[in-house]
Regions:
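A short LG(V/I)-centered, amphipathic sequence patch enriched
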Residues: 50-67, 146-163
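A late-sequence structural motif
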Residues: 362-404
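Secondary-structure junction motif
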Residues: 281, 295-317, 383-392, 401-407
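Central regulatory/effector-binding core of bacterial HTH transcription factors
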Residues: 121, 126, 130-136, 140-143, ...
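Short helix-boundary/capping micro-motifs
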Residues: 22-36, 118-130
Length: 407
């Protein structure tokens, strides 16, 4: 009877290594030797893995083992997962300590789950509670990983722990490996079609228009997919993206893609000066820079696209007084409604407030205030079919939004 695994670290890592070995060598005996298992043990392990996934990964032929389409996908994802682990522990041994040549090949799923729980929770007690493992089991798992890596992974701080530099690298590798295992389950499992998870980092502009429309269409087409939306600024989201906590970020792109990330533009957005309804400049068709500079401003944090656009607007004169730095559109709206402050925002971000007569745009869209809105992903990320479909929906919705803007 086929089952279905939902937790990535319920999978046996040695059996996953065997999947890659069988696919590469086409032989159970050669694969068994490669992963240091007897052939009967490998046969049993493969059967257990196939039952857990609810999928047939290999077919036996006269000339050896041949991977099914699901087996090919599983082998690719397993290779990617072990690749992330290998890179995270490369050169980890400290102080001349002699570690294992390939520690990632000796790690167990239980060890990785326990270590990641400590990394996320910040203490052994909280990690034990989160995983239903005992504290001694958590301690033992982390200690075993430290022996494999020949390096300290955690450091005590009061009642909790923090990760050492080696621990930080390993935690990222484990998270990225987990992403691959989640994708493996989604692509090969008994309910593979249209199932799985997508974690989206949502920056301010995309929350106003693009993302809600894309999610609405996506959930109608793929009701079994789970979507988790994490809101934040670019600075708050980029490290979780690189760590594998997020799958994709949607919002304003940077001039240069951050390390280990790729950027894909969706459309170009132009900004407006925004103020409260009834502001002294409301109704001014083309306000001068002197007029705009005579009022206080709310601006973005240094280095953010909104801040750079504001600085460019006043490049030919002294910057106006800007006592408030804020990246929260909700807070900005509230301050604007009760003051004579000005700010730069996309009209889409304040469309509802403008329609209700709470805020107003001053003048037209600023021709030089161009922001490219798009998708940021990890360079190593390979989306599942369902995740790739969501990206296509984002592009479709964005094209429609772009056409409306250019009318």
């Amino acid at each position: 009877m086929f089952g279905f695994v939902t937790a990535p670290f319920d999978l046996n890592l040695r059996h996953l290594r065997a999947v890659s070995a069988i696919a590469a060598r086409g032989s159970m005996s050669a694969a068994a030797e490669a992963v240091s298992l007897s052939q009967p043990a490998l046969t049993q392990g493969l059967a257990k893995l196939e039952r857990s996934l609810g999928a047939t990964l290999f077919e036996r032929h006269a000339d050896g083992m041949r991977a099914t389409p699901q087996g090919v996908l599983a082998a690719q994802r397993a290779e990617a997962a072990f690749g992330h682990l290998a890179r995270s522990v490369r050169g980890a041994a400290h102080g001349g300590a002699r570690g294992f040549a390939r520690p990632e090949l000796l790690m167990t799923a239980t060890q990785l789950r326990a270590f990641l729980a400590v990394a996320d929770a910040g203490s052994f007690a909280a990690a034990a509670e989160a995983t239903a493992l005992s504290q001694p089991a958590i301690h033992r798992a982390v200690r075993d990983l430290e022996q494999l890596c020949a390096a300290s992974l955690v450091e005590r701080r009061g009642r909790g722990v923090i990760l050492s530099p080696t621990g930080i690298r390993l935690a990222r590798g484990v998270r990225l490996a987990r992403v691959e295992l989640v994708a493996l389950i989604a692509e090969t499992g008994a309910e593979a079609a249209g199932s799985g998870m997508l974690v989206i980092g949502a920056m301010p502009l995309c929350r106003a228009l693009i993302l809600p429309a894309a999610i609405a269409q996506f959930t109608r087409a793929m009701p079994r997919m789970k979507i988790d939306v994490v809101e934040g600024s670019w600075r708050e989201l980029v490290d979780p993206l690189r760590d594998g906590i997020l799958d994709v970020m949607v919002g304003a792109l940077r001039e240069t893609a951050p390390p280990e990330c790729d950027q894909s533009p969706l459309f170009v957005d132009r900004l407006n000066v925004v103020a409260r309804a009834g502001h002294p400049l409301a109704g001014t068709a083309i306000p001068s820079l002197d007029q705009l500079a005579s009022y206080p401003w709310i601006v973005g944090q240094p280095g953010t696209p909104l801040r750079l656009q504001w600085e460019a607007l006043f490049a030919e004169r002294t910057l106006p007084h800007a006592p408030v730095e804020c990246g929260s559109v909700m807070v900005i709206r509230g301050v604007l409604a009760d003051t004579d402050f000005l700010t730069l925002l996309s009209p889409d971000q304040v469309a509802l407030e403008v329609d209700r007569g709470l805020l107003s745009t001053i003048g037209g869209r600023l021709e030089r205030s161009i922001r490219t809105i798009g998708i940021t992903t990890r360079t190593s990320w390979r989306p599942t079919v369902a995740q790739a479909y969501f990206l296509d929906l984002l592009r479709d919705v964005s094209r429609a939004a772009g056409l409306q803007e250019n009318r």
